[in-house]
């Protein structure tokens, strides 16, 4: 009660306090005017998902001369990675890659945008008619050595692209192992 009495008398004693806050000399001011819609935007909390991770995305964990570890599963020998599956790929070297060996990539729906080919420890040239056949079907082909092909495949999958990979394990000493495999 006493506080209300003091405030009332203080308000009467100082006429400057009766003016609107925007006219007071010490009142904080914005350098720009916001419309009510702008004010509403600043009062809301928004969350934007920058990237949605798919639990079905393929990821190459590691590789060795014996094969690959894909999503924690070991695959021995050459393999073809499709958007949601892994299959054995019946080729021995890059010289065995033909139109027929690539046919599984153009029979899928949704259509694969790009196939990353890992040719072992070196980047090798594929036969021109094989590349031409893939181009005619609207599928891009990226030929790299297997270590770089694994990294490229992981990157493209992480971007959400519909990607396939045809990988031949690198011979000999080239290997990438995960920490879990190194502990075994």
Swiss-Prot record:
Essential factor for the assembly of mitochondrial NADH:ubiquinone oxidoreductase complex (complex I). It is found in: Nucleus; Mitochondrion inner membrane. This is NADH dehydrogenase [ubiquinone] 1 alpha subcomplex assembly factor 3. It comes from Bos taurus (Bovine). The gene is NDUFAF3. Interacts with NDUFAF4, NDUFS2 and NDUFS3. It comes from the Eukaryota. Belongs to the NDUFAF3 family. Keywords: Membrane, Mitochondrion, Mitochondrion inner membrane, Nucleus. InterPro entries: MTH938-like_sf, NDUF3, NDUFAF3/AAMDC. GO terms for cellular component: mitochondrial inner membrane; nucleus. The lineage of its organism: Eukaryota, Metazoa, Chordata, Craniata, Vertebrata. GO terms for biological process: mitochondrial respiratory chain complex I assembly. Its main location: nucleus. The keyword Ribosomal protein does not apply.
């Amino acid at each position: 009660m006493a506080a209300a009495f003091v405030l009332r008398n203080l308000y009467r004693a100082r006429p400057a306090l009766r003016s609107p806050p925007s006219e007071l000399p010490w009142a904080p001011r914005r350098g720009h005017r916001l419309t009510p819609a702008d004010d509403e935007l600043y009062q809301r909390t928004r969350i934007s998902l920058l990237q949605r991770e798919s639990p079905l995305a393929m990821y190459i964990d590691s590789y060795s001369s014996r094969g690959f570890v894909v999503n924690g599963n070991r695959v021995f020998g050459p393999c073809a990675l499709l958007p949601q599956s892994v299959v054995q790929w019946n080729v021995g070297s890059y010289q065995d890659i033909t139109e027929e060996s690539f046919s599984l990539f153009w029979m899928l729906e949704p259509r694969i945008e790009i196939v990353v080919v890992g040719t072992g420890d070196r980047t090798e040239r594929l036969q021109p008619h094989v590349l031409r056949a893939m181009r005619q079907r609207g599928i891009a082909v990226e030929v790299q050595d297997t270590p770089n092909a694994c990294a490229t495949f992981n990157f493209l999958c992480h971007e959400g692209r519909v990607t396939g990979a045809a990988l031949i394990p690198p011979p000999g000493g080239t290997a990438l192992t995960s920490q879990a495999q190194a502990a075994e």
